[in-house]
Amino acid sequence: MALFSFGSPAQRFAKKFNPLRDTVYDAGGMFSGSRMSADLAALQPLAEAVGAYSAELADLLWLQFVVYRKRQLHTEGLPLGQRALLMREAKGGLTPTERYEQHYALGESALEAEDYDTAVEHLQQSAHWAEQEGATLSLDQKLGIREEIGYALHEAGRFAEALVHNQQLLADARAAFGSDTDVRLSGLINNLAQNAYELDDTAQAQHYLQQRLALGQALKDDAIVLDTLFQQGVLAHEGGDSALARSLFEQRVAIARAGGDEDLIEEAQATLDELAEREQQNS
């Protein structure tokens, strides 16, 4: 019998790891991100001694991902989080909520890293698990995940996929909200206009912008109206219809003046002046 017992590798790992984990997840706690990353990296040989596919190693890798995410070092942390989740999924036992949350965290981190294809992959998985029994998400949260998928598809340059995705999402959102004039539809309709624009389908882009303008007018939401008129003006200018562009920008100035917001008035007037200057240069 050994004179001294130092415990199993799992016990030795837990003794060092658990206090670090508790510190990271303490909502009111403070710690040095770089020091925490170094302390966790130093534990990797001990976690690997427990097993190359052990729960301990998966937990360590995930916590490293969490810390890197807090430090906004998404490119560094993302591969660690992905590896951890693969190990956890291989072992089984994750609840739908855990799968939704972890895929969502990876998707959000991938967005921050501008790794949009990876973001699509994890956000789609998150949306899938969010629909399973036992996952407790509100309707707005579920639709929000799907809107982020559309954004990631667009940023990945997958414009046709983004358009189809967002068209279905718009139909589902209208049905869920029971209204065509819910302010939550504004961003989605705008995304569709952007998808169509990138596909060089100006007519469809104008169609969606007109829908968004009507929504803003119905809601009496000057922010939506002013932004949409600006986009319509840009499309008109790019299409060579300077008279229409000028008319749309003049409408923006009139609406801004009626609202009395000096910043909006200044911005709308500056846009109109810039258009006039460009017209003069091109004449």
Indicate residue ranges for each PLM-predicted region.
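Tetratricopeptide repeat
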Residues: 36-43, 77, 81-84, 119, ...
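Residue register within tetratricopeptide repeats
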Residues: 34-37, 75, 117, 160, ...
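Residue signature of alpha-solenoid helical repeat architecture, marking inter-repeat boundaries
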Residues: 7-14, 55, 97, 137-140, ...
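Conserved alpha-helical positions within TPR/SEL1-like repeat arrays
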Residues: 25-29, 59-70, 98-112, 140-155, ...
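Short coil/turn linkers that connect adjacent helices within long alpha-helical scaffolds
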Residues: 49-53, 90-94, 132-137, 175-180, ...
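Flexible inter-repeat linkers and adjacent short helices
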Residues: 1-103, 283
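TPR/TPR-like (Sel1-like) alpha-helical repeat modules
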Residues: 242-260
